C-alpha cells in the first residue's frame, strides 16, 4: 500500500512498467493531477485540505531508505508540489498551464539554485523540498498569469 501511495497512486509504477522508462513519471503524475483539478473544479479550501493530506500521505508512504536514493517511481512528491501550484487559480486553464510549466522546468533543471539546495536535506524531506520550492515558483507564476488575466477583462 505504501508503495502504491508513494508512486503517486500508481502512476510512477505504471509508467515505468508499461514504457520501461524511468523518466517521465515525474511529469505525468502532476499532469494528471492538474487535469483532474481543472475538470473537478475544486475550490481553494478543498485544494488546501488536499495539499495537507498529500503531505501527510507522503510522509507516511515514503520510506527513508527509498528517499535516500530518490527512485523515479516515487512521484507523490511531484503531485504535492503541483498541488501548491493549483492553489493560484484551480478553475482557470491558462494559470494552471503556466504554473505547471514553471513547476516542471524548475524541478527538472533544479533552477534557480535554491531549488537544488533544498535537496540537501537528508531522507524524504530532501526529496520533497525541491518539489515544494519548484511548486512555490509555479504558484507565483500561476498567480501572476491569473492577475494579469483579470486586468485584461
Spans of model-derived segments:
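Hydrophobic alpha-helical transmembrane segments
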Residues: 1-68, 79-153
Amino acid at each position: 500500500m505504501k508503495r502504491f501511495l508513494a508512486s503517486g497512486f500508481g502512476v510512477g509504477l505504471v509508467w515505468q512498467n508499461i514504457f520501461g522508462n524511468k523518466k517521465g513519471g515525474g511529469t505525468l503524475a502532476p499532469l494528471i493531477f492538474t487535469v483532474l483539478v481543472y475538470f473537478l473544479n475544486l475550490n481553494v479550501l478543498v485544494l488546501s485540505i488536499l495539499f495537507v493530506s498529500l503531505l501527510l500521505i507522503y510522509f507516511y508512504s515514503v520510506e527513508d531508505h527509498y528517499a535516500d536514493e530518490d527512485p523515479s517511481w516515487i512521484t507523490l512528491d511531484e503531485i504535492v508540489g503541483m498541488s501548491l501550484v493549483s492553489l493560484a487559480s484551480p478553475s482557470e486553464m491558462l494559470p494552471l498551464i503556466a504554473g505547471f510549466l514553471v513547476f516542471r522546468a524548475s524541478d527538472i533543471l533544479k533552477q534557480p539554485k535554491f531549488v537544488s539546495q533544498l535537496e540537501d536535506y537528508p531522507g524524504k524531506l530532501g526529496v520533497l523540498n525541491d518539489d515544494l520550492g519548484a511548486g512555490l515558483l509555479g504558484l507565483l507564476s500561476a498567480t501572476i498569469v491569473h492577475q494579469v488575466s483579470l486586468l485584461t477583462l
